Amino acid sequence: MNPLKTFGVKVNIYFMRIIHDELKILVIQKKGKDYWEFPNAIFKEDDEILEVCKRAASQVINHIHLGNFEYKLINNFINDSLIEVNYVILHKKFKFNFIYNDLLNDINWFSTKKLKDNFLLSQVKFNEIVDFTKQFVKSNYANIRYFISGKYTLSELQKTYINLGINNKQFYEKRNFRKWLFIQN
């Protein structure tokens, strides 16, 4: 028995959006597979992490646009003999032009419940992602633009902050929220 255990390294990419006041994550179903998964790629010997992230993202995004995205580390964990590294992919203009290709059967946005029902994320892992999102937005309130559409009403923006659990007394009254937004910008 070999005392040195080797691990593979898998990089998962999370495309996240707030759709109908709920945080959702993009999942894919590859052809010939009967399960959903996150866009991912396996780390090869001479790979750099950014290249692996781009390779995972290229499953659903055209290669031409990959340079316009940022990748932020959420967490990592060991699952049997596989180390999973999780990144959120960000785009300032919130534009994702997803492509269907011959490797994919379907793509979809899953809420917390659907992610748990399909055994994609445990509640603990989903909470880590939500916590990351909250902290990312709290670090700079303008970061909310990474998760919502470019066109939104003041009420939608206000609800988004509240639904993310970013509690600030100014968020609950529209007049105060408007003043707070003006000060932030």
What are these regions (language model features)?
Residues 2, 7-11, 24, 50-54, ...:
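Active-site segment of metal-dependent pyrophosphate-handling enzymes
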Residues 46-50, 123, 171:
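Generic detection of long, well-ordered alpha-helical segments
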